[in-house]
Structures are given as C-alpha cells and as structure tokens.
Amino acid sequence: MNAPAVLPEAQPLSHEGSTRTGVLVLHGFTGNPSSMRGVAEAMVGLGHHVEMPRLPGHGTTVEEMVTTGWADWTGEVRSAHGRLKARVDEIVVVGLSMGGSLTLWSGFELPDVAGLVCINPATTPQAPEVLDMIQEMVDDGTEIAPAIGGDIADPEVQESSYDGAPLRPLLSFMREGLTPMADRYGELALPLLLITSRQDHVVEPANSEHLAATYGGEVEHVWLERSYHVATQDYDRADIERLTGEFVARVTAN
C-alpha cells in the first residue's frame, strides 16, 4: 500500500546558509511545516542554515498519524539536528505548540544547542482524569476526535492542519513527552525566548507561565496581544520572526 501524498504546503525545508549557526524549526501537533514556514524563511534570509522537518504522520492524512507517537517525532527531530550539526557550530531550536515541547526536549537531549525559542508551548500534561477519559475513548474504539487546530485571529489566514485529532498520538504526547519533562525545566540553563499569546484556545497560557516560573536559565518572556494559538501565521507573525532573528544573533557567535 502506497503512503499518502504529502500536502504541497507541508513540504519540509532544508537550507545551507553562510553563517556557522543552524536553526531547527519545529511545527505542532496535527499541523505541518506550513505553520512555521515564515519563521524558517526569515532565518534563511539572515543567512543561517535551516532544517524544518515534517514530523512523522503530519502533512498527509490524519489516518496516517494514528500510528505515530512521541518516539517517532523525537527521532525525526534528532535526525534533523544531526543534519544541521554536520554543517554548523551551534544550533538554536524554535518550535510552536508541540514543536515548543520538542524544543524543550531538544534542550535536554541534544548537543551543541545554544538557545531555545518556544511559541505557545505545551509544557504540562492534561489532568490525569482527562487522560483517563481519552484512554477510555480509545479503548471503546474512538481513534480520532474533533480537531484542535486552526486557532488564528486573522480572518484572512487559514492554518493547514488536520480536521481531526488522533487520540493515541495525543496520549503518547502527554504521557511520554510532557509528563517526564514537566517537573524538570529547572535543569535547563540555556537561554530561552518564550512567546505567549494572551488568548490561546488550544494551549492555555498557564503552560508558558509554568515554564517561565520553573525554568533554570535566562528567560525572555514576550506576550502577544493580537494573536491566537498559531501565532506564527497570525497578526504578530512579523514580530515573532524579528524577535527570533534577534535572539539567534544574541545567543550565538553570529
């Protein structure tokens, strides 16, 4: 059986730059690289090497995502990091939503990371009773629930994401991804740029507040007043691209 085709807007990006800095750009749960393309292209414009992978199960069909989980996504992040590391001295990791969670994972697990940029990251799992409810739905045969994507204030912009949320991967994200990290952020000392939308209907801003309050290193916390969850495609997208570029310059030799 042939694998489903990748959506045109979901293609990954790999760019060889002129500096010795790499930027690893990560999208979120049920989304695809299109949500982060503006950030990636801004980093290309600054001359940096860029890798923006398409996470397994994303950018094709929601049915393909059902069989993927945290280990698949971290594996792809590790591979993209390796491709970057082969041609740069240091790397800044930038992620939106679950991509922000993977950014934090990168800070724990990957070498030669100079700084982290988290945009509306998920940092703590849902309450145990919520996870138990999701598990019961899966046990009863429900694989896909209504979508959680598309939270953009700008009416002219539509996010490319699935119209359903696969529940097994969601449980994997919460249990294998967030639960082990949630009380460890104090161990991270890398510079962190944390960008948070005050109005976010997907990931509660309390996730960012928890990260800022418990983080072990320097935190620059910027609040967005005009954008919703997918802020990288929303009213504040140009500010996010500018702030990210300035942060990369500040924490690296470039």
Across the structure, where does each feature detected by a protein language model lie?
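Short, surface-exposed "cap/lid" segments of acyl-processing enzymes
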Residues: 4-61
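Short beta-strand/loop motif that positions the catalytic acidic residue
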Residues: 188, 194-196, 200
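Catalytic histidine neighborhood in serine/cysteine hydrolases
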Residues: 51, 209-230
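Active-site nucleophile elbow and catalytic-triad environment of alpha/beta-hydrolase enzymes
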Residues: 166-184
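Gly/Ala-rich beta-loop-alpha elbow adjacent to hydrolase catalytic centers
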Residues: 95-99, 103
